[in-house]
Amino acid sequence: MQIQFKLNGKMVNEETEPNETLLDFLRERLNVTSVKKGCDEGECGTCTVLLNGEPVRSCLLLSVQMRGTDEVTTIEGLAKAGEMSDVQEAFLEKYGFQCGFCTPGMILTAKALLDENPRPTVQEIKDQLEGNLCRCTGYEQILESVQRAAELRAARR
C-alpha cells in the first residue's frame, strides 16, 4: 500500500503494510531511529512525534493513516540550517537528559506546548509532559529545560 506525507519538511512516498505502525515505518523503512520503541502501548512517550504540530504516540498510529497533507516532525526536523532549536538548546544547557532515550519525545512534547503556550506555568509543563516517562533524571532538570526554552523564545521575539 502506498502512502504519502511530509516528514521533517520533505515529501515521503513509500510502500507500507496495512498493519504497520507509524513507529515501525519510521524506524524500519526510513531509518529514523530517534523515534524510540519503548512500551509499544502508548504509555511511555518515547515514540512521540509531532503530527501536524500535535504530539502523538507513533506506536498507536498506523502508517496508512498518513495522508498527503499530513506533516510528521521528528527531533531531526527541529534543527534548522544546523542550528539547534530553542528547546534543544535549553535541554543541553540545563542538562535535561541523562541516557537520552526519552529525550526526543520530551523535546517534541515541550515544543508543542511552547508553540501553543509560550509562557507555561510549572504545573502546565508537568501536565503536558505527564505521558513522557524518564527513568534517569527525576524530572527536575527536564522541567527547568522547558522553562529555559520559554525564556529563550521570549528573548528572541
Where are the regions a protein language model picked out?
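Signature of N-terminal electron-transfer/Fe-S-associated modules in redox systems
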Residues: 1-157
